[in-house]
Design a protein with these regions (language model features):
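N-terminal leader/targeting and assembly helices and adjacent pre-domain segments
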Residues: 98-99
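C-terminal alpha-helical interaction appendages
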Residues: 1-95, 108, 115-139
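Small/polar glycine-rich anion-binding or flexible loop at a beta-alpha turn
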Residues: 102-106
Length: 139
């Protein structure tokens, strides 16, 4: 089980992903840009000032860093929140970097798995996503 601060950061990242839709960012491109960004790498660190920044500040920093694309396909809020939450939880659960997590579970996969996995515990959903990646890697 994660600690309170870690769960708060999972919630913050879920809200950040929701905010990206409100700001009209293409969801797939936004998620890819974020997960591969220096901003996400900073949040991965044990202690970093970005962990205390709000969603709006993080979004503006990411906009300066990677300039995600506006318009395009925008996912629903529930899928975005779940994806953001699970990606951050995954980092705390396994210690993997955001960049490595995204390689295993890109935005399209998270969107397609949302309906099946969103009612599972975060650990179970992550384990299944990792299993799927390893199976795909074998073939």
């Amino acid at each position: 089980m994660l600690e309170s601060l870690e769960l708060t950061l999972c919630d913050m990242q879920g809200k950040l992903f929701e905010l990206s839709a409100k700001e009209n960012f293409d969801s797939e491109k936004f998620i890819k840009a974020f997960m591969n960004s220096e901003t996400a790498a900073d949040i991965d660190k044990p202690f970093n000032h970005m962990q205390w920044a709000g969603e709006s500040y993080i979004l503006s920093r990411l906009d300066e860093e990677n300039t995600p694309v506006k318009g395009g396909c925008i996912y629903d809020d529930e899928t975005l929140y779940w994806s953001g939450y699970i990606y951050r939880y995954w980092h705390y659960y396994t210690g993997e970097s955001s960049k490595n997590i995204y390689k295993q579970a890109p935005a399209k996969l998270m969107r397609s798995m949302y309906l099946m996995y969103h009612t599972m515990s975060p650990e179970m959903a992550i384990d299944r996503l990792k299993e799927s990646f390893l199976e795909k890697k074998k073939s």
